[in-house]
From Swiss-Prot:
GO terms for cellular component: extracellular region. This is Antimicrobial peptide MeuNaTxbeta-2. Expressed by the venom gland. It comes from Mesobuthus eupeus. Disulfide bonds join 32-82, 36-57, 43-64, 47-66. GO terms for biological process: defense response to bacterium. GO terms for molecular function: sodium channel inhibitor activity; toxin activity.
Amino acid sequence: MMKTVIVLIVFSLVMIVVKSDNGYLLDKYTGCKIWCVINNDSCNSHCIGSGGYYGYCYFWKLACYCQGAPRSELWHYETNRCRA
């Protein structure tokens, strides 16, 4: 019984790691990255609201970067549809 519980816990942790990623947050309305200048609090709120665990404003790209968010919440160059 104890082995089964341990296997289930390990499997759950692996699934959490596989489903999360790091990247720029996606504005689903425009298809663009969520922009920022210096507001880490705003980016962190967007990131946590999207299922990530920490977000910050990446100043050189002027966009919110999120760690641990689902891939569906992140901007990807391959699927870019931003018209801004």
